[in-house]
């Protein structure tokens, strides 16, 4: 199966079988949750890149994206070029920390800063193993690249605009956190969710046995339609810190091909740090 997705092609998905046949034509990024997982086993040729490299504290928000110049340096030092680049994660075999979001975080970070040919390995390392893919403990030699980062400002929405438009009739604000957190059981200074946010837990879109593997498209469409996420609406993806939302941003923008999708990167964490902002508890958006 060829790389698939309905967006502009910046992000697509691939199967293990496709990767096996195209190993010589792609770069590969391993973003397993801990370096020890990569040391234990990785796909041959994969360079390790941790998702935590891309965010830092800013103002009262503890996890915002680092400046363009810093990202450019990371990409260059990791040898990343604007060529077909496969991203995958595993289950955290050594430390047990993995939740599957590592690969959507890194894929989004690549896209956000100008990479134009990102291939997400659907099912991650687990599917690679299931398909009989080769594993190694040998590290590739990394050569510095000349990557030029360009921030894609149309991928995200910042707080002032978010607050101004979030209740517009043509806007649908999604909250990708688990239902119990959305309803009020999270660790934030205020409980619940942003008023008007509709809960679409990111994990509901994934295979229950492998959270890096998308459910069949018909099941995904049934879920997104059930919350009113139709292509004619402006979709804003949010969660706790902007991490879970990357899964839904990639899915809506490049898997389903929706025309107007952005992430509120500050998400519930930034929202709750502003004293006057209200929150809602329980299962209803308002």
Swiss-Prot record:
Q: Which PROSITE patterns match?
A: RHODANESE_1, RHODANESE_2, RHODANESE_3
* Alphabetized InterPro entries for the sequence: Rhodanese-like_dom (IPR001763), Rhodanese-like_dom_sf (IPR036873), Thiosulfate_sulfurtransferase (IPR051126), Thiosulphate_STrfase_CS (IPR001307)
Q: Which SUPFAM superfamilies match?
A: Rhodanese/Cell cycle control phosphatase
The catalytic site is made up of 239 (cysteine persulfide intermediate)
Which EC number applies?
A: 2.8.1.1
EC top class, as a word: transferase
Which GO MF terms are attached to this record? thiosulfate-cyanide sulfurtransferase activity
Per the record, what are the reactions this protein catalyses?
thiosulfate + hydrogen cyanide = thiocyanate + sulfite + 2 H(+)
DNA repair recorded as keyword: no
Q: What is known of its domains?
A: Contains two rhodanese domains with different primary structures but with near identical secondary structure conformations suggesting a common evolutionary origin. Only the C-terminal rhodanese domain contains the catalytic cysteine residue.
Name the record gives this protein: Putative thiosulfate sulfurtransferase
């Amino acid at each position: 199966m060829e790389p698939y997705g309905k967006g502009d092609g910046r992000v697509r998905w691939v199967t293990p079988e496709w990767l096996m046949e195209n190993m010589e034509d792609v770069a590969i990024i391993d973003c397993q949750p801990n370096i020890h997982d990569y040391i234990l086993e990785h796909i041959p040729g994969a360079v390790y890149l941790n998702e935590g490299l891309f965010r830092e504290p800013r103002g009262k928000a503890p996890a915002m994206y680092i400046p363009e110049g810093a990202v450019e340096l990371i990409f260059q030092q990791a040898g990343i070029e604007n060529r077909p680049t496969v991203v995958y994660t595993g289950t955290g075999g050594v430390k047990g920390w993995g939740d599957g979001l590592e690969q959507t975080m890194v894929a989004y970070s690549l896209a956000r800063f100008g990479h134009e040919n990102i291939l997400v390995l659907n099912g991650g390392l687990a599917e690679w193993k299931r398909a009989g893919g080769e594993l190694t403990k040998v590290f590739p030699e990394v050569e510095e690249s000349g990557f030029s980062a360009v921030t894609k400002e149309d991928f995200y929405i910042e707080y002032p605009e978010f607050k101004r438009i979030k209740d517009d009739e043509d806007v649908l604000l999604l909250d990708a956190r688990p239902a119990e957190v959305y309803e009020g059981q999270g660790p934030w200074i205020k409980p619940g969710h942003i008023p008007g946010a509709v809960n679409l837990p990111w994990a509901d879109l994934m295979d229950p046995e492998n959270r890096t593997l998308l459910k069949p498209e018909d099941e995904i469409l049934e879920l997104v339609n059930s919350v009113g996420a139709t292509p004619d609406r402006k979709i804003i993806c949010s969660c706790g810190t902007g991490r879970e939302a990357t899964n839904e941003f990639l899915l809506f923008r490049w898997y389903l091909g929706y025309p107007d999708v952005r992430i509120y990167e500050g998400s519930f964490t930034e929202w709750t740090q502003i004293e006057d902002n209200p929150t809602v508890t329980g299962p209803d958006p308002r």
